[in-house]
Amino acid sequence: MHPIKSESAVNTTEQMGVPGPWYDRLPHFKMGFKPSAGKELQSEYFVPVEHAYEAIIALESLQAFISPYLFISEIRTIKADDLWLSPQYRQTTVAFHFTWKQDSEAVMTLLPLIEEKLEPFHPRPHWGKLFTMSPKVLQYRYERLEDFKQLIQRYDPTGKFRNDFLAQNLYSTT
């Protein structure tokens, strides 16, 4: 079954408890096929799992605003880890994933509303997906960020591997 009802299941992996190798079960879509709906936008936020219920209720209050722009959403849990810049650093989280229709203006208007609703639960956004959280707030959420910056300075002192995203989100104080 395809998570988006209007799409064919031909490009999806077998699901619903069917045993198989991890590479055929963890992803929703088969290698070499169009993922999801094709042209789309994505965002994802992680909150400590103990706040799952309250976060779900908070997001549900935005349903009327979110639904017109949403292809699919997913809620999942992820075990804590020890990776400094992981949203799961020392905390098991619940993730709220959104696959949006390709309407950048609408999505970028919705994200601050979602972030505001999740704020009491100290959300951490997915680094590789859309978010509007300020660099100051983002930096505060990652307690080992300063240690990471020291590693960057040690191993990349000239900034060869830095880009605008890192400059804005890791080094900006706004």
Which role fits each region the language model picked out?
Residues M1-T174:
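Noncatalytic alpha-helical scaffold of FAD-dependent oxidoreductases
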